[in-house]
């Protein structure tokens, strides 16, 4: 048994398998950041912080001594509770193929959104600076007319190249912007195809973000550091329900300020 305490949950192996499958499917469907940043191997439950490699000057304890603190970034634990019906869980053992796992999917979607917003917008309470505020490139404005979006993306790519940032490059679009470029054509040619010709990486649906981001995916510029990856744990139960949660521990580091361009409405 570990500190997820899953062995204490009144959940059969077959039900666990379905719950985990729904959680994994939903999380992967909504997550975008992990497709464009480096993801370090999980350090394990004992990992409380990651080193930045920097030193911080501190007052020496006595004359003739130079003192420094090793700078580090603490990991934040993100937990999303959800509740399942015991009848829905037990129905799996009786052969049910349509148990209601909507609470699982809602929790997985929420955790994916929180992780992506942490990566792109930052999380000041957890000492995490996001890609938007860390970027040293001037932010660009997304036009209202989707037919003008390729020109702005091209401008963002030029900013990256002029800053000496090599590709491949990817573009992340919020849900509304992605819909616009997918549904709009210019002289019979889909805007999405215009973007595909400009970008040598991926055009990514990123529902958690606002606006868009253009960044390099060459590696070494952005790092999602995990203590424990996404997992399901047990909280409690009664005669009718089982209370579980999705959880991960992480921090995020931006190493190269010039490796991204943010686009806002």
UniProtKB/Swiss-Prot annotation:
Post-translational modification as stated in the protein's UniProt record: The initiator methionine is partially removed. When isolated from culture filtrate isoelectric focusing gives 3 bands, none of which are glycosylated.
Keywords, sorted A to Z: Cell membrane, Encapsulin nanocompartment, Membrane, Secreted, Virulence
Bilayer topology: Peripheral membrane protein
InterPro entries: ENCAP, Encapsulin_nc
Coiled-coil ranges per UniProt: none
Location of the protein in the cell: Encapsulin nanocompartment; Secreted; Cell membrane
Gene3D superfamilies xrefs: 3.30.2400.30, hypothetical protein PF0899 domain
GO cellular component terms, A-Z: encapsulin nanocompartment; extracellular region; plasma membrane
Pfam entry (one): Linocin_M18
Phenotype when the gene is knocked out: A single enc deletion survives less well after 3 days in 2.5 mM H2O2, pH 4.5 (mimics growth in the phagolysosome). A double dyp-enc deletion mutant cannot produce encapsulin nanocompartments, cells are highly sensitive to H2O2 at pH 4.5, mutants exhibit significant dysregulation of redox homeostasis, survive less well in C57BL/6 mouse-derived bone marrow cells and are more sensitive to pyrazinamide treatment in infected BALB/C mice.
Keyword field contains Cell membrane: yes
Main location per the UniProt record: other
Assigned protein family: Belongs to the encapsulin family. Family 1 subfamily.
Additional note from the record: Stimulates a strong IFN-gamma response in memory immune C57BL/6J mouse spleen T cells, recognized by monoclonal antibody HYB 71-2.
Record NCBIfam families: encap_f1 (NF041155)
The protein's role, per its UniProt record: Shell component of a type 1 encapsulin nanocompartment in situ; its cargo protects against oxidative stress at low pH. In situ and in E.coli assembles into proteinaceous shells about 22 nm in diameter with 2.5 nm thick walls. Cargo proteins are targeted to the interior via their C-terminal extensions; empty intact shells can be isolated in E.coli in the absence of cargo protein. There are at least 4 possible cargo proteins, DyP (encoded in the same locus), FolB, BfrB and Rv1762c; DyP and Rv1762c have been identified in vivo.
Subunit note: Multimeric. The encapsulin nanocompartment is formed by 60 subunits. Monomers form pentamers which assemble to form shells. There are 12 pores where the pentamers meet as well as 3-fold axis channels and dimer channels; none are larger than 3-4 Angstroms in diameter. The N-terminus of the protein is inside the shell, the C-terminus is outside.
Name under which the protein is recorded: Type 1 encapsulin shell protein
Naturally occurring in which organism (per UniProt): Mycobacterium tuberculosis (strain ATCC 25618 / H37Rv)
Lineage: Bacteria, Bacillati, Actinomycetota, Actinomycetes, Mycobacteriales
Gene behind the chain: enc
């Amino acid at each position: 048994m570990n500190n997820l305490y899953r062995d204490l949950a009144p959940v059969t192996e077959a039900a666990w398998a379905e719950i985990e499958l729904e959680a994994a499917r939903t999380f992967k469907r909504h997550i975008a950041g992990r497709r464009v940043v480096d993801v370090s191997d999980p350090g394990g439950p004992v990992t409380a912080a990651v080193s930045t490699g920097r030193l911080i000057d501190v007052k020496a304890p006595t004359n003739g001594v130079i003192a420094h603190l090793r700078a580090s970034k603490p990991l934040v634990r993100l937990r999303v509770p959800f509740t399942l019906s015991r009848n829905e869980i037990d129905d799996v053992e009786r052969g049910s193929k349509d148990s209601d796992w909507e609470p699982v999917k809602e929790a997985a979607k929420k955790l994916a959104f929180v992780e992506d917003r942490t990566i792109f917008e930052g999380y000041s309470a957890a000492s995490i600076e996001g890609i938007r505020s860390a970027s040293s490139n001037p932010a660009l404005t997304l036009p209202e007319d989707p037919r003008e979006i390729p020109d702005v993306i091209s401008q963002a790519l030029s900013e990256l190249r002029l800053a000496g940032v090599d590709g491949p490059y990817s573009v992340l679009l919020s849900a509304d912007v992605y819909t616009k470029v997918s549904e709009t054509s210019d002289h019979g040619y889909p805007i999405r195809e215009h973007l595909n010709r400009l970008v040598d990486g991926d055009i990514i649906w990123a529902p958690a973000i606002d606006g868009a981001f253009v960044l390099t995916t060459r590696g070494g510029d952005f790092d999602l550091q995990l203590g424990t990856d996404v997992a399901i744990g047990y909280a409690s139960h009664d005669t009718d329900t089982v209370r579980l949660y999705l959880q991960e521990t992480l921090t995020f580091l931006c190493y190269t300020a010039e490796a991204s361009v943010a686009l806002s409405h």
